[in-house]
Structures are given as C-alpha cells and as structure tokens.
Amino acid sequence: MTLAAPRLNRLPAGERGITIGDFLVPIAIGERISERARHAALIVIGAVLIALTANIAIVLHGQTFTLPGDVRVTLPVSPVPITAQTFGVLLVGGALGFRRGLMSAGLYLVLGLALPVYAGGASGLHTIIGRDAGHWALGATGGYLLGFVLAAAIVGRLAELGWDRHVGGAVVAMLLGNVVIYLVGVPWLMVAAGFDLTTGLAKGVYPFLVGDIVKLAVAGIIFPAAWWLVGRGDGTR
C-alpha cells in the first residue's frame, strides 16, 4: 500500500474517477445519451476482450495451453504456462474503472452461461455450479470466474484513484487483483475437487506464478505509458 499512496496526493481532484478507458471511445460526452452510449460501448468491448483472452493459446516448450480460466484438475505442474485471461480481466478493470469493470466482467460471466466464451470454449452454468449424480457440485473453474468480477472491480477502483498512472501503483493494483482471484478461486477449487490446501496451491496457484510476474511487469509498463500518451501521466495535466 505504501508504495502507491504517496503518489495519490498528486492526482488533481478533477482527475479522480477518470480512467484510461475514457480516452478509448471517441464519443462526445456533451449529451447524456452520448455518455451512456460511451459507457455501454466500453462495457461491451471489455467483455469481448476478456472472452478473446480466455481462448488465446500460449505455446511454451512445444506445448499449447489455453489457461487460465480453464484451470483443470489435471493441470500439469511443469512447464509453467504464461496465462492470458487474468491479464485481460485486470486490464479491463484498470482501463474501465470500478463500475464499468465490474459490469464488463459480469457481462462476460453471464454470456458464458449460454455462449462458449469461457476458456477452452466452455459454457453453461455447470462450469460454475451444477448437478452431479443428483447432488449440487461446484465446477472447478467457477471460483476463478467469480473472482474475475471482484478483481476487475477492485483494480478499477484503484485506477480511478490514479494508481495506474505510475509503475509502482500499477504493479500493486494488478497484484491485489491477482490475490483476489486466488482467494476466491483456490478454496472453490479445493471444494470442487476434494483437494487439501497443499494440493490446491499446487494445482491452482503455483503453475501460474511465472505468468503472474510477467503480467505485473507488463501492466507496470502499459498503463503509465498509455497515460503518458494522452498527456495525463502520473496525475499531471
């Protein structure tokens, strides 16, 4: 927390609540309907981006992965996959802010109930929770999907406060978003698969740590660079 807090004081009051997403859709804000159209467009674009990153295949050491989002019980421990979807979720949250990030990730979650937009082309309520042999059962990936919504909202709120305008704040915001995803996803996976804590961490956390480090580094570059390009870097006009 202390890493980003000192910089927040530099953010002008008029800048708070503005995210980099406000510069992405060229629709005038003058009239109320135009503002609503801009927000709606950003929410839909964010949901589409999350869906696309859910199905980006990552190739490492000659093997292809489509993780995370599709965190399978049979996930190999090695080689460690570099993931795409969690970065997409956190990117959308940081770009759109609290409400739009929350709604965008939520829209993606709802779309996946009927359309094959979850990782690996999965879809349906059973991915989150369903009936198995007459009993309710949790889907192994359901916790991660729900965690995406919370993470997008949290990262979005931090972006509204200006954390993403400098390297330290962007990295910390993304780190907190990742932690939230794990806090929801790992216990859910443990219950769904009958894992103990050690196995849950081995299957649901450790294989993604290298990818997480890469995401944090990329986020620490992308967001401050984007703010610099629009002339609002580090909270300055």
Where are these regions (language model features)?
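Hydrophobic transmembrane alpha-helices
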Residues: T2-A105
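Alpha-helical transmembrane segments in multi-pass membrane proteins
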Residues: L42-T53, V89, G93, S104-G112, ...
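Short helix-perturbing small/polar motifs within transmembrane alpha-helices
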Residues: E15-R32, I50-L52, G124-I181, P224
